[in-house]
Amino acid sequence: MAKMEVKTSLLDNMIGVGDMVLLEPLNEETFINNLKKRFDHSEIYTYIGSVVISVNPYRSLPIYSPEKVEEYRNRNFYELSPHIFALSDEAYRSLRDQDKDQCILITGESGAGKTEASKLVMSYVAAVCGKGAEVNQVKEQLLQSNPVLEAFGNAKTVRNDNSSRFGKYMDIEFDFKGDPLGGVISNYLLEKSRVVKQPRGERNFHVFYQLLSGASEELLNKLKLERDFSRYNYLSLDSAKVNGVDDAANFRTVRNAMQIVGFMDHEAESVLAVVAAVLKLGNIEFKPESRVNGLDESKIKDKNELKEICELTGIDQSVLERAFSFRTVEAKQEKVSTTLNVAQAYYARDALAKNLYSRLFSWLVNRINESIKAQTKVRKKVMGVLDIYGFEIFEDNSFEQFIINYCNEKLQQIFIELTLKEEQEEYIREDIEWTHIDYFNNAIICDLIENNTNGILAMLDEECLRPGTVTDETFLEKLNQVCATHQHFESRMSKCSRFLNDTSLPHSCFRIQHYAGKVLYQVEGFVDKNNDLLYRDLSQAMWKASHALIKSLFPEGNPAKINLKRPPTAGSQFKASVATLMKNLQTKNPNYIRCIKPNDKKAAHIFNEALVCHQIRYLGLLENVRVRRAGYAFRQAYEPCLERYKMLCKQTWPHWKGPARSGVEVLFNELEIPVEEYSFGRSKIFIRNPRTLFKLEDLRKQRLEDLATLIQKIYRGWKCRTHFLLMKKSQIVIAAWYRRYAQQKRYQQTKSSALVIQSYIRGWKARKILRELKHQKRCKEAVTTIAAYWHGTQARRELRRLKEEARNKHAIAVIWAYWLGSKARRELKRLKEEARRKHAVAVIWAYWLGLKVRREYRKFFRANAGKKIYEFTLQRIVQKYFLEMKNKMPSLSPIDKNWPSRPYLFLDSTHKELKRIFHLWRCKKYRDQFTDQQKLIYEEKLEASELFKDKKALYPSSVGQPFQGAYLEINKNPKYKKLKDAIEEKIIIAEVVNKINRANGKSTSRIFLLTNNNLLLADQKSGQIKSEVPLVDVTKVSMSSQNDGFFAVHLKEGSEAASKGDFLFSSDHLIEMATKLYRTTLSQTKQKLNIEISDEFLVQFRQDKVCVKFIQGNQKNGSVPTCKRKNNRLLEVAVP
């Protein structure tokens, strides 16, 4: 019997209604009740056609396990109960199999679960796509980008402990197999005002608390931070700790994620240094100080914080202090410097902190994009995931809410357009007559905001750029003049009389009728936030930082690239970003996730109907259902429809052998459903009213009950017959076993009797044999005993004889030993006597010889005594000298000049020689500590000392700086891959220098490369080689004696490289570059390179000899030397 495959459906075991399109009747109350019923049963997902509604459960649910992923993998969208995995799988399969770019739009208010929804989408796609080391690395980098962005872009709010304070759009790129290749992240409207001020009960961005909680003491000391939150004005104290959040563990997670994404250690440390600088900026406080002209000037109260900030960022303290006290306004050739009062100084401080953090966040996004972007250039498929603010209506709505709601208006507009477009395309594709759908078109609201002439954003930009006094009130007056007659704009001060007595509309506000309802905006702060003004002095101060990251964040601060053009406003930038986003979304197939927050307490099992109703209205969910139901409420392919309802018709049950459409037609005709309630498309059947579908479900449920009864009847009959046959078979078996048992029992009794008789007979025979054996044994034992007694008597006799013989032998031995001892003692006595006589003779002879010698040499004793005493004394003095020198040895440092003094004059030469030998020895010991690389560094430093010491004023500042050579890391930076491939030799120097234009003295950035044989110049942006000079053609290097980085490279006349003339450069690493060029040229050409140090020298520019003259510059022009071509024969360099 063939096994029947059971196919599930969305309608099986449905709690409430799984698809709101099928809700009957459809109104706000039934919509909310259906959501609540499903929420109470932990069903947090509900469909509106292909749109997923997600209600935040505020608890963990067991519906995201790997088993669930496999359950929804490659399944039809309506085959299982509603789930975010179903939408993710549908989008992924459409991208992989149909080659359609996809986008998933996730919207909802803060705390509704948008960020978690985006993570679930990404984790599902990562789980179902291909495997492999490279693919897994890409997936891991894409997933680990989330913790980094959350740390820097999320914060605790009253609505959400992990609220995204920026909009994020990620394009995930796939190859033709559906494997991820990389991604690109775009961010929108970071809430940077949170950096300097947070509402009560909320926190600053997570990274500040994570850094202070999780960083080691060593790192905190390096960043000049303390672990106490109360030490920093930018951190709110009432919500510093969040229940269930471990900031220290999260910090370790973020550091690990940064490493996985591709951040190098020095990059991560640079980022944390910027975060620390932002924190410490909030601790700078100002006090007023009166000037002679009567105006107040701001002064910093405590300069310790400023000093630590400058040490972190590498900015000169006086430069930053001046930027907080003065503001310079430039207009063409004029500069005007004005003092800042205390309020302006605080504004400048906060503006700097906000700009520094927001630019750092943008840099982080770009840096992550560099790591996760696809490296291959093959054609890619794209899935975009949009996680952005939902519609916001607060008690106080400002510029941020206005911009956010504008973005949501655009998203609502594209949602309605794409939904209608999708409906229309399906009707046309299925050859169904198209029914026009009436809906509210919010294009008029979008035009009110974004119109280039009369739009609110355009008028706000116009007001910001207008000369004269510009305030929020003047902006509101302009709105009242232009927008008064607009049907979606309301203002108390407008010409429209119907709002003059509206007390709910304050004079300083205006109201817009959005698609989600009316929103009242406070006009205060609109102009200031739109300007987003950062004083030029602060930008220039940041650009002067030695901290490379901070310097790169403020390119407009470069004095060489002064741009007097006003930067674009925040509103215009966001408008352009939204336009780009909308254009991008329109090229993709949309998928929607609408997130809803069930309560404001962030608690599980609580469903606030009023709050949910508010969200349903501004998300336009009822409008969405009505659009879906305007034509046909339900549509389904013929095959699953016939499979589900075939039991309702005898002709189609149990199997239909024709086409599926014919079977559905037969089925519906049999059920007598009115023809106006359904329509047959090319591949689907369309049902107009949900009641028809529910009728089909009721009939199916009744039929299933009937079929269940039939199956039970047949099963019970089969069970009874099977039981009877089993009992009959058992009776036969039992009878056979009983007969066998009776025969076996009778046989056992007979066998037992025979065994008993046999055992008695065998016992009698055995006892008889035992008696005979015992008698024989006793006889043998008696014979043995007699023989033993006789042998014992014989042995005792022999023992007595042997003992007597042994006693006689012992007596003889004792007598012999006593005799030998007496003989030995007599011989010993004789030998001792003879030895005493010999000793006496020797002593007498020695005494006689001594007497004889003393008599002969007595006359010499006194003369020799003095000489011996002198030699002994001299030897003792030298010995004592060496012992004292051993204890007084100086340190092993070669630069230690100390040496013990000598005690006696005659030791002078020895003392000096010993000092020389000791110095040579300790120098050798010091040199032996160095590695070959360190020796090379010291050789270069020694070479630099010989070339520039006491000759070049810049030299002392270079002593403490290590020579690095490859500052650009060309081998690691993919930007310079083309340049790296073009150079086959070892790169000795890779540095960005300023090349001085021969014609006008202006500078251009070039990459300066020195290899073993050549000197090369390359374009900084493209990496293309512009000039290549063999080292044999370099004849001389000229520079001034002053504290500047200008130098000239002279080329051999007539060489190909010298066609345009000598080169003139400016570099921050002049000493290192000149030293390495000198050593490389010497190694290559075996000739010393001429180094000329003079404040005037000649260079060859084409056919002209030009004098380069160094003069004292004006301090007002800053600390950077300037170069100017005076005439055809003179080029002046002004050094401050």
UniProtKB/Swiss-Prot annotation:
Modified residues (Phosphoserine): S60
Domain named IQ: residues: 704-733, 728-748, 750-779, 779-808, 808-837, 837-866
Cross-referenced Pfam families: IQ (PF00612), Myosin_head (PF00063), Myosin_TH1 (PF06017)
GO cellular component labels: actin cytoskeleton; actin filament; brush border; cell periphery; cytoplasm; early endosome; endosome membrane; extracellular exosome
Domain Myosin motor: 15-701
Keyword Nucleus listed: no
Binding annotation for ATP: G108, E109, S110, G111, A112, G113, K114, T115
Region Actin-binding, residue ranges: 578-600
Cross-link (Glycyl lysine isopeptide (Lys-Gly) (interchain with G-Cter in SUMO2)): K287
Keyword list, A-Z: Actin-binding, ATP-binding, Calmodulin-binding, Isopeptide bond, Motor protein, Myosin, Nucleotide-binding, Phosphoprotein, Repeat, Ubl conjugation
GO molecular function: actin filament binding; ATP binding; cadherin binding; calmodulin binding; microfilament motor activity; phosphatidylinositol-3,4,5-trisphosphate binding; phosphatidylinositol-4,5-bisphosphate binding
Function: Motor protein that may participate in process critical to neuronal development and function such as cell migration, neurite outgrowth and vesicular transport.
Family classification: Belongs to the TRAFAC class myosin-kinesin ATPase superfamily. Myosin family.
Protein name in the entry: Unconventional myosin-Ib
UniProt source species: Homo sapiens
Lineage: Eukaryota, Metazoa, Chordata, Craniata, Vertebrata
Chain's gene name: MYO1B
